[in-house]
Amino acid sequence: EQVVGVTVYRWGGNRCIGLSGHVVGVDFPSEYSDWRDVEPVELVTAEVEKRPTQENIVAALRRMARNASHIHIATDYDREGELIGKEAYELVREVNEEAPIDRVRFSSITDREVTEAFADPDDLDFDLAAAGEARQIVDLMWGASLTRFLSLSARQLGDDFISVGRVQGPTLKLIVDREREIDAFDPEDYWELFADLTKDDETFEAGYFYLDDDDTEADRVWDEATADAVYDALAGASTATVAEVRRRTRTDDPPAPFNTTQFIRAASGIGHSAQRAMSIAEDLYTAGYITYPRTDNTVYPEDLEPRDLLDALADGPRFGDDAASLLDAEDITPTAGDEETTDHPPIHPTDELPSPADLSDEEWEVYELVVRRFLATVADAATWEHLRVVATVAGEEQDPSLKANGKRLVDPGYHAVYPYRSTSENYVPDVEEGEALALTDARMEAKQTQPPRRYGQSRLIETMERMGIGTKATRHDVIQKLYDRGYVEGDPPRPTRLARGVVEASEEFADLIVSEEMTAQLEADMQAIARGEATLDEVTDESREMLARVFDRLTESRAELGDHLRDSLKADKTVGPCPESDHDLVIRRSRHGSYFVGCDGYPDCEFTLPLPSTGKPILLDETCPDHGLADVKMLAGRKTFVHGCPLCAAEAAEEEPDLVVGSCPECGEDGGGELAIKRLRSGGRLVGCTRYPDCDYSLPMPRRGEAELTDETCAEHGLPGIRITYDDDGREPWDLGCPICNYREYQARQAGTELETIDGIGEKTAEKLKQAGVEDVSGLKSAEPDSLADEIDGVGPDTVRNWQADAD
């Protein structure tokens, strides 16, 4: 049924309403809303007020609560869920002071666990909720005041304001610091030497090694003359004598259960970003297939019966054989990690089993990862046999030593059910000490030391966890916001020039903004609130004092800070030299909101280049060898793409021949116009009339992929079908068919109100969107991604942008 436009589920005398995330938020009073009229420092001491963020849900909840005899709060079982529950509690109490209110907690949405949770309810944890509220207030104070200060100082307002926050700043500094290490790295030359050894026609590779000054084995030779001497000795020898043979057996223990961080790490290994992995996991949890995906726990609770879950999996079609093989064991003892908490169990499958047909390919891939991790935790250890062989060579000036390490998987153990870890073997034949081996093909390889690797998303999350930056529930969202704001690009994330400028300015004028100690201390304070050892007011007052000290330093250096940021912003937008003047080409924005490349010498020089209409441009480090212009990348969610050199793109668009499709329906047979696939200077494409501008009839076309005509002809319009093929990413060809029919179908979809026509939006997600006030595709397209994402659990701004891109 509908209550004030909100879907409510009814059975018997019970009614259930979904809150769809926070329904009440914190904000500053309206008199602080004008960025230009209010000094940012005033926000440090400004009072914070609560206000409904989803008024329709609030109204529905109040109406239902007035006559309710009993209220159960069953929000997510974590800090944010407890705060959402407290928001509901306070709204109910405004209209109903008598009805009992209890708290129901569960970690998986299965019939058994939900039924048991409602049979044994608890009280709301107001301390835990206060910790969540403290986080809200602190994030608002730091984020709003610092974002306004930096943006105003740099005169960078509108959609391109400079965003900063208490968790975002330290995370960005981690990425920038690593990039500085890479830039400052001075590679050193070294050499490695190898030779092939043979016994009974079985050849294996051995590497040269020596003992360094610390009596430790080393295989890198830092002096070229020494490397040459070793090579001469190896190349001049025909045999090597076995000096040492060592055999050992190694136990390879199964992995610990998944917590959030380790899940993200494993998901990245199969190609999923942190944000995408968590989004999929949230959907699987909501569908009842896995337990709650936000957890620090790596120890299964005592009430989890692995054998029962294996029985359920054994009855399923996809994991039955693997689960059945594990049930044969007399004793099933799961592994345990180092972290044990009492809120949520580690991530594992429930006994609600989907089939591949129930899930998308991505969802099934992540679900299988979770299932197989559980199977691995109750499987036996694997066993490896290792063989180390050391052989010496008799040379004229020195007797170099060679070593080879062989390994063989004797018992696969958990690897049989968990194929995500390497089981590659290295064969070395059995030899005996004193045995002579034939030596052939000596070789020397010149190498250089490599700079430290950039943080991959999963490793960045692990580092944030170790340093106390953010929480299990927020770290992946923080990284996604860095992408959304244009602070990082690529994977692994690489800082843009703007990111460097913000970090440099923060370090110089107020280093607390990017200090991990500050955000880690605040996280510790919030945990103290949850334990009842501190109060919300104590923590927020402490945070105000810290923020006031930051503003003392910032205010003293406002002019210098603004200059520094403006220089960084200009560098971040400078594409390269203008071909028609002595000025630079920079990325600009038209008064209509679209991006283009224009000369910094305007109006004296009016040279411009178009940019694609989809996405937000950022500059890459790669430079066009022909024009000296930086390559441009367009950020557009999952449809992000590299546009390349804007001058090359414009020239290519002008040179690309049109592909004639057929007669133009506007011109008619006597008009002589033909429809052709045309490439625009912006990089886009359309099907348009060859008589343009006399005839401006056109139809949209996908930007990417190669267009070709098919043999099938439209019976209604007499036009051949169009097929789009993709050579670079393995996607299946897209048969558009007749371009006129295709466009009519597109218009029909756009005119519709069905949200589920968008890829990634199923029935449950569509319901969440409607509860957040988005009723149809048109409403989705006009929504502000960050605001909408804040209202829907498990959905990030990038996901919203992907939906909007699909809707376009």
Label each residue range with its predicted role.
Residues 13, 91, 296-753, 775, ...:
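Basic, low-complexity terminal or inter-domain segments flanking catalytic cores
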Residues 22, 64, 71, 91-95, ...:
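Conserved, well-folded catalytic cores of nucleic-acid-processing
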Residues 1-132:
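Intrinsically disordered, low-complexity regulatory segments
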Residues 135-147, 195-199, 249-260, 275, ...:
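Core structural elements
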Residues 750-808:
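C-terminal extensions
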Residues 53, 67, 109-197, 247-248:
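C-terminal or mid-to-C-terminal helical accessory/interaction module adjacent to the motor/catalytic core
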Residues 6, 13-53, 162, 166-282, ...:
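Long, highly charged, low-complexity internal segments
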Residues 1, 60, 83-91, 113-117, ...:
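Alpha-helical scaffold elements adjacent to nucleotide-binding pockets in ATP/GTP-utilizing enzyme cores
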